UniProtKB/Swiss-Prot annotation:
A GO cellular component entry from the record: ribonucleoprotein complex
Protein known as: Large ribosomal subunit protein eL21
Protein species of origin: Pyura stolonifera
Similarity comment: family membership: Belongs to the eukaryotic ribosomal protein eL21 family.
Key words of the record: Ribonucleoprotein, Ribosomal protein
GO biological processes: translation
Region feature Disordered, mapped onto this chain: 127-156
Superkingdom classification of source: Eukaryota
Cross-referenced InterPro entries: Ribosomal_eL21 (IPR001147), Ribosomal_eL21_CS (IPR018259), Ribosomal_eL21_sf (IPR036948), Translation_prot_SH3-like_sf (IPR008991)
GO MF: structural constituent of ribosome
One Pfam family it belongs to: Ribosomal_L21e
PANTHER family reported for this sequence: 60S RIBOSOMAL PROTEIN L21
Length: 156
């Protein structure tokens, strides 16, 4: 029964996890979404209104429109050999803020702090990220003689 073409073949992705069934927590509705926010799309099976198509499940996009109950998201979708920026409307139950932007925001705050300190001390600071450099060379000293390692001969 592999590669079935049934109507419910992809419906498992919208099912909720164990102990997460039932009513939706209030913080889902109290989360603020603004234009330009990066969000992850994850379809919630307990809400069928304005649910994203299963193609967009697990995708990340940017918000371009905010309404009372839903948001408009720009998502990249691959169609044959090209990638198209699709605009979809999704209710807020099916999205959450993406964690991919957290490291960037932390870096921005850290750079602002460094820039402020440098301005106070009147020095120039480089805020560009540097790739990891090769390790510095060092000598390995050992008082013991090197040990010769040989395979044990096979005996039948």
């Amino acid at each position: 029964m592999t590669n079935t073409k049934g109507y419910r073949r992809g419906s498992d992705m919208f099912s909720k996890k164990f102990r997460e069934r039932g009513a939706i927590p209030l913080n889902k509705y109290l989360t603020v979404y603004k234009k330009g926010d990066i969000v992850d799309i994850k379809g919630d099976g307990s809400v069928q209104k304005v649910c994203p198509h299963k193609v967009y499940h697990g995708k990340t996009g940017r918000i371009f429109n905010v309404t009372q109950h839903a948001v408009g998201i720009i998502v990249n979708k691959q169609v044959r050999g090209r990638i198209i920026a699709k605009r979809i409307n999704v209710r807020i139950e099916h999205i959450k803020h993406s964690k991919s932007r957290i490291s960037f925001i932390q870096r921005v705050h850290e750079n602002e702090r460094k820039r402020k300190e440098a301005r106070e001390k009147k020095i120039r600071v480089n805020l560009k990220r540097q790739p990891q450099q090769p390790r510095t060379g060092h000598f390995v000293r050992s008082s013991a003689e090197p040990e010769l390692v040989e395979p044990i001969p096979y005996e039948f």
